[in-house]
């Protein structure tokens, strides 16, 4: 059976070594807290202003300020900073936390488009860090897609086999 990380690599086109190159240096020390706050604010401004109703609806039950805080705290923690997210919310458990949302290929690509644009606008992040971060984000987005697909497979209703008798389908209803 293929692991979710392996499936994420296949779906995203980013192998695990590239995805986790963010661990080779401490991006939090390099970039600082405010850079992550600015990135998440820029990103969620784009998300909440998205013209595509199907995408915007994914976030309709989420408070924008909470989403910004959750994201930048997770990024800070994941990229070498203090465990802000875990201190406030517990283990990140990304798949579980994203369970209520329709994390599809299309949604992941749209999310990544907004993140790429937010990164492109971030003058405080050097190009090498942007590339490493985007590879991590792409792999992680498709890790969530793989988790969502697995969840959907496990939640499919189990139907009892119908009678495969060819005569039953053509039999006239009795009155």
From Swiss-Prot:
Expressed ubiquitously, with higher levels in root tissue than in shoot tissue. Disruption phenotype: Slight reduction of the number of shoots produced by root explants in vitro; root explants are first cultured on an initial auxin-rich callus induction medium (CIM) followed by a transfer onto a cytokinin-containing shoot induction medium (SIM). Its cofactor is heme. One of its GO terms (molecular function) is heme binding. InterPro entries: GlbO/GLB3-like (IPR044203), Globin-like_sf (IPR009050), Globin/Proto (IPR012292), Hemoglobin_trunc (IPR001486). Heme binds at residues 85, 98. PANTHER family: TWO-ON-TWO HEMOGLOBIN-3. Hemoglobin-like protein that exhibits an unusual concentration-independent binding of O(2) and CO. May promote shoot organogenesis from root explants in vitro. Inhibits RGLG3 and RGLG4 ubiquitination activity. This is Two-on-two hemoglobin-3.
């Amino acid at each position: 059976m293929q692991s979710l990380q392996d499936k994420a690599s296949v779906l995203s086109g980013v192998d695990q070594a590239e995805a986790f190159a963010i661990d080779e240096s401490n991006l939090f020390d390099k970039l600082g807290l405010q850079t992550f706050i600015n990135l998440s604010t820029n990103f969620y401004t784009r998300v909440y202003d998205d013209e595509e109703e199907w995408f915007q609806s994914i976030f309709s039950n989420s408070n924008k300020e909470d989403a910004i805080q959750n994201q930048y705290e997770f990024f800070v923690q994941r990229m070498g900073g203090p465990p802000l997210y875990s201190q406030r919310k517990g283990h990140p458990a990304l798949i579980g936390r994203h369970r209520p949302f329709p994390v599809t290929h299309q949604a992941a690509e749209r999310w990544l488009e907004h993140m790429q644009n937010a990164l492109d606008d971030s003058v405080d992040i050097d190009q090498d860090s942007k590339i490493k971060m985007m590879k991590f984000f792409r792999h992680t987005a498709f890790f969530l897609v793989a988790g969502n697909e697995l969840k959907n497979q496990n939640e499919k209703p189990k139907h009892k086999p119908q009678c495969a008798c060819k005569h039953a389908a053509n039999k006239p209803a009795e009155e």
